[in-house]
């Protein structure tokens, strides 16, 4: 049986949804499997910034540093913060048990020329 950890998604800065998620999946995959509004227009291929999320510093510091390709995509993200990452690049490990993931209030999808709210 796959080991699971707790992941809490913070939606619109007020609503929280905590789910149990298997280790080895990405934040983007977990959001989609729980019907949360995290776009992921490129389906996790690191070609957009629509799965941009913000983390608490404690969990941000537990992740490997973002690759140059991820940093380039993050530059396009709406509402970028010092603890922003792409959900497709955050793979769950035991060390991330209890992680809180803040979903942005909007995304910028350059394929559609504008913002999604």
Curated annotation (Swiss-Prot):
Task: Report the cofactor remark.
Answer: Binds 1 [2Fe-2S] cluster.
Classification via Pfam families: Fer2
For whether the record's keyword set contains Hydrolase, the answer is no
One of the entry's Gene Ontology molecular-function terms is: electron transfer activity
Keywords per UniProt = 2Fe-2S, Electron transport, Iron, Iron-sulfur, Metal-binding, Transport
Give residue ranges for domain 2Fe-2S ferredoxin-type. 5-107
InterPro entries in UniProt: 2Fe-2S_ferredoxin-like_sf, 2Fe-2S_ferredoxin-type, Adrenodoxin-like, Adrenodoxin_Fe-S_BS, Beta-grasp_dom_sf
Domain of life from the UniProt record: Bacteria
Q: Which cofactor does it need?
A: [2Fe-2S] cluster
Q: Name one GO biological process term.
A: P450-containing electron transport chain
Q: Does the keyword Oxidoreductase apply?
A: no
Entry binding sites for [2Fe-2S] cluster: 42, 48, 51, 88
The task this protein performs is described as: Ferredoxin are iron-sulfur proteins that transfer electrons in a wide variety of metabolic reactions.
Q: Which family does it belong to?
A: Belongs to the adrenodoxin/putidaredoxin family.
This chain belongs to the protein called 2Fe-2S ferredoxin
Which organism is the protein's source? Rickettsia typhi (strain ATCC VR-144 / Wilmington)
